[in-house]
């Protein structure tokens, strides 16, 4: 009995290693996603964002965006960048996620929320380039402390950018960033994440003082 069990474990080990290796290489190694956050005034706790991604896995027919705990999402939209076609989007919560048979990669709780974007099932060799836009409200991660804006969020994608609200300038960033100014005068921070995990980004900023007339 013990010999049979040991043999089974020996046979299972290479399979488990191969599956783990495939999981590590299949998504992150080819990922070209980028995301841009446009911060609204900090007292609103809200920010708009868009992210681009290319889906190329055969048989895939939807994209799931699981909303982080403590956040709420509104106005989700998705378009095919190659054609401009708008895709059907729905937001599911709690029991509706279970009823739809959707696996969000974590236990489904009453407060769980996921944005589901559906598209025709991809054939072998086919790719789909998407742009997804949403508005989030997250008082725990985006707030005003005294006169200082605080944005505290982890980034998992390779390329991430944050655009400060109009009139704000950067005071601190916990992660190295490239600063630039947008055409409408807003400060933009670009982050690169070369790691297979997340970077914890903490940004603080203050509002510029109005210039007084001479």
Where are these regions (language model features)?
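Positively charged n-region of N-terminal signal peptides that target proteins for export
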Residues: 1-4
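Solvent-exposed beta-hairpin/edge-strand motifs
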Residues: 61-101, 152-176
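Intrinsic-disorder/low-complexity, polar/charged segments enriched in Ser/Thr/Lys/Arg/Asp/Glu/Gln
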Residues: 34, 46-50, 59-63, 114, ...
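Beta-strand elements of well-folded, non-transmembrane domains
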Residues: 41-45, 51-59, 68-70, 121, ...
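A surface-exposed beta-strand-loop module
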Residues: 75-78, 82-150, 182-214
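Early extracytoplasmic/domain-onset interaction patches
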Residues: 19-67, 114
């Amino acid at each position: 009995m013990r010999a049979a069990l040991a043999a089974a474990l020996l046979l299972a080990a290479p399979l488990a290693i191969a599956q783990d290796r495939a999981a590590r290489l299949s998504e992150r190694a080819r990922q070209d996603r980028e995301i841009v956050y446009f911060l609204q005034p900090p007292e609103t706790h809200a920010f708009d964002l868009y992210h681009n991604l290319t889906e190329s896995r055969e048989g895939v027919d939807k994209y799931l965006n699981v909303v982080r705990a403590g956040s709420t999402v509104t106005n989700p939209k998705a378009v095919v960048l190659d054609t401009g076609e708008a895709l059907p989007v729905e937001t599911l919560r709690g029991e509706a996620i279970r009823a739809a048979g959707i696996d969000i990669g974590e236990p489904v709780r009453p407060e769980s929320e996921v944005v589901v974007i559906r598209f025709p099932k991809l054939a072998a060799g086919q790719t789909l380039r998407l742009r997804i836009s949403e508005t989030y409200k997250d008082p725990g991660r985006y707030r005003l402390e005294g006169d200082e804006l605080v944005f505290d969020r982890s980034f998992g994608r390779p390329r991430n950018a944050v655009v400060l609200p109009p009139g704000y300038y950067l005071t601190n960033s916990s992660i190295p960033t490239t600063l630039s100014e947008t055409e409408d005068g807003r400060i933009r921070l670009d982050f690169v994440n070369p790691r297979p995990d997340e970077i914890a980004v903490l940004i603080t900023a203050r509002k510029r003082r109005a210039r007084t007339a001479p």
